[in-house]
Every structure is written in structure tokens, then in C-alpha cells.
Amino acid sequence: MDNLSFHDGNIFNLLHTRSQDPSHEVDQRMQFHSSLVRRLSQEQELEGHQGCVNALAWNSNGSLLISGSDDLRINIWNYSSRKLLHSIDTGHTANIFCTKFVPETSDELVVSGAGDAEVRLFNTSRLSGRAEDDNAIIPSALYQCHTRRVKKLAVEPGNPNVVWSASEDGTLRQHDFRESTSCPPAGTAHQECRSVLLDLRSGAKRALADPPKQTLSLKSCDISATRPHLLLVGGSDAFARLYDRRMLPPLASSRKRMPPPPCVNYFCPMHLSERGRTNLHLTHVTFSPNGEEVLLSYSGEHVYLMNVNNGICSTGIMQYTPGDVDNLFSFSNNLHDVESPPQVSTTPQNGFHRSSNAATVKKCTELVEIAKWSLEEGTDVFYAIEAANEVLDAHSNDIESALRHECLCTRAALLLKRKWKNDAHMAVRDCHNARRIDASSFKAHYYMSEALQQLGKCKEALDFATAAQHMNPSDADIVAKVESIKRDLQAAGAEKNEETGAGTTRVLSLSDILYRSEANSDSSHDMSRSEREDSDYDEELELDIQTSLSDDEGRDTDSNSMRGSLNLRIHRVGDDKPMENTVDNASSGTASSSQNDRTSYQPEGAIDMKRRYVGHCNVGTDIKQASFLGQRGEYIASGSDDGRWFIWEKQTGRLMKVLVGDESVLNCIQCHPFDSVVATSGIDNTIKIWSPTASVPSIVAGGSAGPATANVVEVMESNQQKLSRNRENPLSVELMQRFRMQEFAEGNFHPFECTQS
């Protein structure tokens, strides 16, 4: 949008500053300056793998790039020449999902983790030095203590002795090369290695208010570069967890399942913290370069930024509790947190003093008028939202409350018109903040009622609509809104009565569950509290299936044990009809025990989102990354199921660049430690190297498939439709992983040829 400026200043001024003051800070600001980001294009394509490239990592000085692939090989590339130095036949028997250089080893030690549940360490000094002559070498260390796929490895800067591995078995293990270089396979008679740093086999939460109970299949982990005692993990539920390694219990054996240790913080957007999102899970978590923020990427969702430490910012970021989630949707005439007038900020940002004078106010006023015009005309809604983001996220402290209130209401209305996934939840936030400024705001109440109606919360919507009608009884729109909500309530009541009369037990085939489309991605997830309490549908279903599929310690089932068709009997808790034989008395006792656990459990708080980044699609793989670009981390990048990768401005969420990087799905994004260079990979067998070589800055540039001609908004609209059609089902992620590994006799369910999940 031409009306929006960039917040990192003029690059020529930076170059002039560097000539006068050659400081490291100027170089950091130059690395991914907006003018360079908008000139990124594909520089080279690295060929050397024969399968999907699932992992990328740079060494500490950026001279080498390492990659891991479905071809079971690790490749090491020279950055300067862009040539393949080594190709290691690892000996893994399943896809390699992660690989790293071990710090302070002259880049001679590399480590890999794979789908065979093994972690392998290699010494590259034993290789021939020519990639075409490299053969399988004996690992310097071999750890076989995991029981399921190893999805992510972490190393500590400056520590050459330890590597951490996160696995779908629910454990994060610490491997110290000084203590041992091997451990026997899990489940063997002599398997007693004490390497479990985090035991989260009973750590997954259905909701913030629920106690941890199910296995948390770990998908990602990261160690803070600035505070290496901080450890971040994410997996098969909605909550990323921050741990202080100094406060964790001693390393333990995996023979006994331990209760999950307390974490420093949970991270989860407030609207994703409720029950009813069974299949929601994280695919990537990472710290910002300065360690003050974390980035979360969700499957079937967006990318979210959060503060590591609890605090308040322009978006109202805070640590919330389960009660706060309910309060956000509840009508109250007395808002206890009415906003106080903001303090005008004069803090320098990016080396330049932020304007707090009349020019800034004039600019913000113009942007709000542009957004309001787009709302009235129904055109350019995406860019109008970006204009509102610029005002609220970049200049919130520079404007008066009245203008901020107007912008909040306008953005809420635009979000409700756009209707991308969870836009209605973002509108609820804006309306809530607008009501904090003006508790008698007609617009805030009207748009809140519209947002809640879109979310299927009709009772709450009627409260706000009625209040708005009292404020302006002659407004035709609010009269129509009240009647519309009343009709929705009547229809919902009739449907509920019909279901009650027909009975609540029904038999579904597995295909019914796996391929059930959600009609409305927002409303299908957001039942009212009373409706959620009336149904324990998800938990009961998972209990039935786990009883029939799992054996004693959560070990993997035999590959032949699930052949043939599978029918599931589903019923609500409290149904008078007897349960099928899939659940025995012991399981019934477990269900009763879980209810008691939930009653006695004291809910913890979580840190809410700071920013949301939208436009990509993440449903096809669970290794899709979201990364900070540059040493200052001022830009956010994510891969997408459409083969593109997206770059946003961190501060405002403004879309900066869309690049085609894969013919199918792009997963991995790793920026160079110091240069304006990015490496990406995905389903293709090649690695793409990107640098700011385009002659003209633009939001879209040529990629591996040639110049992109599609309209950017149309591309994002298509991705949002895929997210909304994302097949939501009551099977947990843990169980879905088991089904993916099987082939049914009917031949209706087959794994992908190139599996990156």
C-alpha cells in the first residue's frame, strides 16, 4: 500500500551513517532492511538430494549450510561457492527431520534425528573430502532411546558436549557426549539410559483450564541464544511451554512415566486456548534473536508472536487465565479495566525518533479515513486492514483515544467483512479494547454482536446487540441484527431438541471422521460454555479408540493390527445407553477419574498473542517453520502449502514479500547469520538460495516456477479457504499419527509418497 511507509528509515542514510560510524548495530540494521527484503529473488538452486529436504541449518559463522532429506543423507554445502562439500549416508532407516552443527567443534561434528527414532552423531573429519566419494561412516554416537520419530534437535551456543532431541514419544532428551556415545533401543532388557530432561507423556492439555493428561507429541524445541537456560517446546496441543533448565528435576529414565514438571510460562493465543480444537497443534517454535519474543506456527492456523515475559503493550498483551477467556465474550456495563490516556512516546525506534507531532496524527487520520472508505465501498479490504494495523500497531501511543477508538471499530468491521480464519476473534479483541476507551460506544457494541454471531455465540451476541439498540433505538441495522440473532437462537434450540429426541449415540466409520469438513471454521469451534459443558464428546471418543489401539506403555502398535474397516461408537457422557465393548470398566473408571482431576486442578495462566501473521497455509505438513529474519529479527517468514513463502513486517504484520520457492509445499526457512541471504526447502529435492538481487523492489517476485503473476490477495484468499476447509475431526493428533502409518484393506487410505509429517 503506497500510503504506508517503512519503519527502518532510508537505506542510503544508513549507508552514510555506516561510513561515519562503522558499528555492528548499523550492519545488523542493514542485513534485512525493507528495501533489501523487497528485492529478494532466487539466486541459486542447490542440487544434491534425491528426496524432500526436511531440515536446514547454518553453522555459526555462516560459511556452511547443512541439510537433511528423505533420501537418508546429510549434505554439507559451502556458502561461498554454493557447492556440495560432503554427502553423508547416515544409516538412518526413515526420513531425516532435523540436523545441526555441534557448536565449538570446528564444524566437524554434525548431528541428525529421524523418523526411525534415532539420534546420530557424525565426525566429518573422517570423510574423504570429496562429496562423490563419501560413503556411510560409523556414527561417533548413536542414541536409540526414543520410541517415536525425532522431530527437532537443539544445541546450546558455545557448548560442544550436549545436544537435545524432541520426539513424538513425549520426551525431550539430553544427550551428553562425555557420558555416553550410545544407548540400546527403547524397550530392550538393558535399556536404562537416564537422558529424559522433560517427560511430557502426560503433559498435553485440551484447554488452559484442563489438567495435563494425554501424551504431548513434541514437534519442535529451541534454546534461547541469549539465555541458554531457557528451553521452549511445542507439540500436539495448542500450548508452547517455556522451561528453565536450572529448575528442572535431574535426568530420569523413561521406564517410569513422570508427571510433567511446572513450566515458566505457557504461550497460546487466547482464542485458541478453549476446548473443542482437538486437532490443533504446533509445527514450529523459536526464540527471537534477542530472546525477548517467541514465534509459534500452528497447523491449520496462523503464525503468532508473543513476549517471553509477561507485560502490557499497545495490543493489551497480558497473561490471562481461563476466566479471562469467558470475560472477553461477556457483556458488562462496568469495565474494570477502562483505558487511561496514553503517554506520548518519544523513545527512539530503529535509530530514528518516532514522530509524535501533528504530522504523525495527520498521517494516522488519513489512514483511518482510507480504511473507513474501503469499509463503505467494500473494496480493498485487505489493504484497509493493513492501514489500520499501521495506526494501531506502529503509532498507538502517538494518537489520542478518540482516533484509536475509531480505528479499532473500523478494523473490527473490516475483519468481519473479510472473514478469514479467526478474523472474528480478532474483531472481538478490537471491540473489547474500543469499549475500554468508550463503554457506551454504539459501534463497539454493534460490531461485537456481529463478531459473536459469526462465532456462534448467539446468547452473548444478543446481549451486545440489545445494548446497542438501547443506545440507538432508531438505527435500522441494529434492529435487523437483533432479529437475526434471535432467529439464530431459535434455530439452534430447535436443532438441539431434534438431536435430543433422535438420541445421541451414532456409529461413524473412520472415513466419516477423517474427511468430515467443517462448515464454518470459526463457529464450529466456538460453542458456548454451556454447550461445551454438556458434551464430553472429544474426550469420550479418544478414550474408546485408545483402549482398542494402544498397549501397555503407549508403545507403537504392530503395523498389521489395524487392517480392515473400523467403526466407532460415539455417545455423550451420561447417555443411558450402554457403551460398546471397546471400553471396559477400567476405562470407565479412568473417565470418572479425569472428571475428578479437572475439578481439583488449579488452572495456570498463559501469555497471549502480541501479533498475528496471515496469508500462508499450514495444513499439509507438521514440520513447517516460521522464522525471524536477520540479527534484529524485524521480519517474520513462513513457508506455505502452496509452495510460496511469505515475509511480514514484525511490528505491524504488514505483508512485505511473497516468493514462489517450491512446486508443492515449502517448509524450511533459515536466514544466513550475517548476510542478506535466505535458504529454503520443501517437497522439492533442491534447496533454494535467495538474495536481494532484483532490480526493482516489489511485493511479488519471480521464484523457482518463474515470475509470479497471480494477485497476492487472491493467493492469500485461496490459502484461507484451504485453512477453513481443513478437515477438523475428533481424533487426537496422537491417534491420527497412528492411522497415517497404516494401510487399510480397502485401499482407501495411503500415506503420501513424500511424507514430511
Swiss-Prot record:
Q: In which pathway does this enzyme or protein participate?
A: Protein modification; protein ubiquitination
Going by the entry's taxonomy, the superkingdom of the source organism is recorded as: Eukaryota
Note the lipidated residues of kind S-12-hydroxyfarnesyl cysteine: 754
Q: Where is this region: Disordered?
A: 519-601
Family annotation (InterPro entries):
DCAF8 (IPR045151), TPR-like_helical_dom_sf (IPR011990), WD40/YVTN_repeat-like_dom_sf (IPR015943), WD40_repeat_dom_sf (IPR036322), WD40_rpt (IPR001680)
The UniProt PTM text for this protein says: Farnesylated at Cys-754 by FTB/ERA1; this modification triggers an exclusion from the nucleus.
Q: Motif Nuclear localization signal: which residue numbers? A: 245-257
What Gene3D superfamilies would the database entry show? Tetratricopeptide repeat domain (1.25.40.10), YVTN repeat-like/Quinoprotein amine dehydrogenase (2.130.10.10)
Q: Where in the cell is it found?
A: Nucleus; Cytoplasm, Cytosol
Compositionally biased tracts (Acidic residues) = 533-543
Q: Where is the composition biased (Polar residues)?
A: 582-601
Q: Where are the WD repeats?
A: 6-43, 48-87, 91-132, 145-185, 213-253, 277-316, 618-658, 661-700
> What's an example Gene Ontology biological process for this entry?
negative regulation of fatty acid biosynthetic process
Q: Where are the TPR repeats?
A: 442-475
Pfam families in the record, alphabetically? Answer: WD40
Matching PANTHER family, A to Z?
WD AND TETRATRICOPEPTIDE REPEATS PROTEIN 1 (PTHR15574:SF40), WD REPEAT DOMAIN-CONTAINING FAMILY (PTHR15574)
User: Function, please?
Assistant: May function as a substrate adapter for CUL4-DDB1 E3 ubiquitin-protein ligase complex. Negative regulator of fatty acid biosynthetic process and accumulation. Acts as an abscisic acid (ABA) negative regulator. Involved in responses to salt (NaCl) and osmotic (e.g. in response to mannitol and PEG) stresses.
Q: Know the name of this protein?
A: Protein ALTERED SEED GERMINATION 2
Lineage at the top is: Eukaryota, Viridiplantae, Streptophyta, Embryophyta, Tracheophyta
Q: Source gene?
A: ASG2
